[in-house]
Amino acid sequence: MSRQSRQGRMNALHWRNEVQKAQLGDNIANHMAYIFMEILYDKFGLSFRQLKNFYDRVIERRKKWQNDDDQELTSTTMLEYCQKRDIKVVDWVKKIPMSHKLYMADLGKNRAVLGADRNIESALVATMLLTIPVLKQSYKFKNSDIHEFLKWCEYFIDSYWRKQPGRKEHYLNDEMIRQLFIEEEHWDLLKGCAV
């Protein structure tokens, strides 16, 4: 095998690993979006209009954060924002069992990619860092509300991971939350409209 061919394969492998890492973050963000919608609607009483507005604002922040040219919204500034307000997002993420985090990233048993633990944790931290300022600034959440929100997120992550006794189904998943909104409230979260 020539050196150029070997280098090409190494580059392809590196590219595939980077794509897998990015996909882990997207998987976590997608699951967390469903969890956020359920918690904010059921536990904090946000309306559908507020939920759609919340989602749009978080996505807007994510795009701004991913823009390398924009130095105003970085991981560091978001972390400092939470630290100044005594919201310990990193500690909260570390408290969640790794098996739960792997499940949220759609990685089954023995399917973890190299370095997945750090990538999953950083994706979960980033998701929360993008979300918390929106809740505090747009919806006037107090620190106690944020801590309750984090508590409910932890509970729902556990419900995603935990299987029902004697069954293969988990207690909760994205489709269950979507169906709940369709059946009870006549709203499709995926389409963002009434049904």
Question: Which residues make up each language-model segment?
Answer:
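Amphipathic alpha-helical segments that form the core helices of the histone-fold
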Residues: F54-K63, F149-Y160
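Intrinsic disorder/low-complexity detector
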Residues: M1-L40, K64-Q137, G166-V195
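Short loop/beta submotifs within extracellular cysteine-rich repeat domains
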Residues: N143-S144, I157
